[in-house]
Amino acid sequence: MCGIVGYIGQAGDTRNYYALDVVLEGLRRLEYRGYDSAGVAVYADGEISFRKKAGKVAALETEIARAPLPDSVLGIGHTRWATHGGPTDVNAHPHVVAGGRLAVVHNGIIENFSELRAELTAKGYNFVSSTDTEVAATLLAEIYKTEAEGDLTRAMQLTGQRLDGAFTLLAIHVDHPDRIVAARRNSPLVIGLGEGENFLGSDVSGFIDYTRSAVELSNDQVVTITADSYEITDFHGAPSEGKPFAVEWDAAAAEKGGFHSFMDKEIHDQPAAVRDTLLGRMDEDGKLMLDELRIDESILRSVDKIIVVACGTAAYAGQVARYAIEHWCRIPTEVELAHEFRYRDPIVNEKTLVVALSQSGETMDTLMAVRHAREQGAKVVAICNTVGSTLPREADACLYTYAGPEIAVASTKAFLAQITASYLLGLYLAQLRGNKFADEVRVILDSLREMPAKIQEVIDNEEQIKQLGRSMVDAKSVLFLGRHVGYPVALEGALKLKEIAYLHAEGFAAGELKHGPIALVEDGQPVFVIVPSPRGRDSLHAKVVSNIQEIRARGAVTIVIAEEGDTAVDEHANYIIRIPQAPTLMQPLLATVPLQIFACAVATEKGFDVDQPRNLAKSVTVE
């Protein structure tokens, strides 16, 4: 999500390119990350010149052709995915402040930007955009002037201490034409090392055409690069170190972060996708703040029914969310396939809240369902991953999932981000309606905040899961069983295997076994079972263990996904995939990940293109 590039070379060298060439090429390489505007800034002859434009890099290049920038050996560039403020020319980066003397680009979300903006406004600063980036740039300028005594590196260190959230910042200043200063926290930044030139990028794609020698920065570090050196410190000025590495991928592989496929990369992106979707949505006291939910509170309090409309994977995310929303809000909640919704004369009125889930925001079936719901007087909240798409424009409000672009057709990180955003919506409604006290909401939010690290634990165990997938490449059919929130996880696991491995797979509610599906179980039949926590509803856990015994007795190969410490499954499982302990409603964020890894491994072993499976499209824009 977003892309950053920085370049500094030596004046008077004999290279056949300038900073602008490097930065624009880097931005093109980073287009796969997704964005809605782009901009560049260069230093030459004592001045910073910049151009920025809503739209694609091509639109920026057209603007530069119309109004050329000077030749320069110092430049920074940015592709923006809108978070605070819409995708406009004004909100695009870079933000140039301090009378044109300082230019800043930024990736991430500054959680405390509202407080900082108020503080800076009180000091007489004016803002021309609605972005958190302009606030960070203005804060950097203020600290540079008042506390850092003209030391740009020190100013960046102090600024890093003041900012909450996730950010990568790059800055150039007319007082320091020989350097770029950058900082990072929970947002990627890599140094590229050349000969008489150095680079910065969100990832190595930004400079892979120029160097294969790189240094990865860690959290809460500041780096100052010149044409022939770099220096890393922490936010308090103490010397620090990065992690040098050699880039062995080509440019195409670099866009995938060195992974075999975009799907593999996006599975690994999931801790960040969940974390970024949570960012900026809680105040310092832990209270949930959904400023994007611009629907009158009295209307939300009067809601007496919620209908989730979606298709495919998004519909399964909605099914997970239903358990949480009904539990927290005590509002009857239905989940409808969007393409069925408007054809069955649904009961919808002004007290109905329709929640529409779509990664792309362009799913035609979902858009048609939304239009029908609004015609009946319902309010619509979109949960979407794509700023500027149709769905947010047609909804009454939108909660964006900050998962970043999802390139692979089969959804992975968008699914977890949709669950996360749906949970935030449910908690907000519970908080607003008084179903949950502030301390109860805070406990649940704390559990959500723990999920990125726990998802990473599951991913760290991927080799065991991949080996299992490779061993089952000749399976003719795979079944998936789950109860409660494990049921939609089973459905999603089956869908992934269908989508990318072209393998017959079915997901069932485990309680349905005796009502028909157990007839499918024969000797050697692989069956995944998602086991609920024994620390939750004991009866539910015991029933699933009983289901495992039933299918094992009929010759099934049982692959059990169970939390750490659950020994009740040990004697009944052929394979056990352990996930970290978590509250029942958080388990889908963990239990889904092994199923994604398994499907990807099976499809890869079969030699299929996991990113572009046959007959499928990423965005279904027809009914």
Swiss-Prot record:
Q: Which GO terms describe its cellular component?
A: cytosol
Task: Write down the chemical reaction(s) this protein catalyses.
Answer: D-fructose 6-phosphate + L-glutamine = D-glucosamine 6-phosphate + L-glutamate
EC assignment: the record states 2.6.1.16
A Gene Ontology biological process in which this protein takes part is: protein N-linked glycosylation
The enzyme's first-digit EC class, named in words, is transferase
The entry's localization annotation reads:
Cytoplasm
Protein name listed in UniProt: Glutamine--fructose-6-phosphate aminotransferase [isomerizing]
Q: Which HAMAP family match?
A: GlmS
